[in-house]
């Protein structure tokens, strides 16, 4: 019963906050609020320019390898085994999959800035 009450209160508060947020958004709409913030100065040109797809690919690659480090560092502590062969095999498989992905991206010229 307590869990049902807590769930009901959470859903009610969430819906109330969503409704209030949408209501206040429509009340205070003016052009200065819609402009991007640029260190307190007026924007120098359009701040809504599209960014390069090459930059996006390099950023995604960086995130993947950053995730690799986040997965590999706690691996010895996460696998509490006396046999380290399984842990080393798991780490090797993870690094191999990421290395194959990097090689594929390199061969497809996804990391080059000029064409």
UniProtKB/Swiss-Prot annotation:
Record flagged with keyword Transmembrane helix: yes
Transmembrane segments: 5-25, 55-75, 86-106
Membrane topology per record: Multi-pass membrane protein
Reaction catalyzed: a ubiquinone + NADH + 5 H(+)(in) = a ubiquinol + NAD(+) + 4 H(+)(out)
Keywords linked to the UniProt accession: Electron transport, Membrane, Mitochondrion, Mitochondrion inner membrane, NAD, Respiratory chain, Translocase, Transmembrane, Transmembrane helix, Transport, Ubiquinone
UniProt-annotated location(s): Mitochondrion inner membrane
A Pfam family of this chain: Oxidored_q4
UniProt cross-references to InterPro entries, sorted A to Z: NADH_UbQ/plastoQ_OxRdtase_su3, NDAH_ubi_oxred_su3_sf
Molecular-function annotations in GO: NADH dehydrogenase (ubiquinone) activity
EC number: 7.1.1.2
Family, per entry: Belongs to the complex I subunit 3 family.
PANTHER family reported in the protein's UniProt record: NADH-UBIQUINONE OXIDOREDUCTASE CHAIN 3 (PTHR11058:SF9)
Subunit-structure text: Core subunit of respiratory chain NADH dehydrogenase (Complex I) which is composed of 45 different subunits. Interacts with TMEM186. Interacts with TMEM242.
Entry function: Core subunit of the mitochondrial membrane respiratory chain NADH dehydrogenase (Complex I) which catalyzes electron transfer from NADH through the respiratory chain, using ubiquinone as an electron acceptor. Essential for the catalytic activity of complex I.
Protein name per its UniProtKB record: NADH-ubiquinone oxidoreductase chain 3
């Amino acid at each position: 019963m307590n869990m049902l009450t807590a769930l009901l209160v959470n859903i009610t508060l969430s819906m109330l906050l969503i409704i209030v947020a949408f209501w206040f958004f429509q009340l205070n709409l003016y052009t200065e609020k819609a402009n991007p913030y640029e260190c307190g100065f007026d924007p120098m040109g359009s701040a809504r320019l599209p960014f390069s797809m090459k930059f996006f690919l390099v950023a995604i690659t960086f995130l993947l390898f950053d995730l690799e480090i986040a997965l590999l560092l706690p691996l010895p502590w996460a696998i509490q085994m006396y046999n380290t062969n399984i842990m080393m095999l798991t780490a090797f498989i993870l690094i191999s999959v990421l290395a194959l992905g990097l090689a594929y991206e390199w061969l497809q010229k996804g990391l080059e800035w000029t064409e």
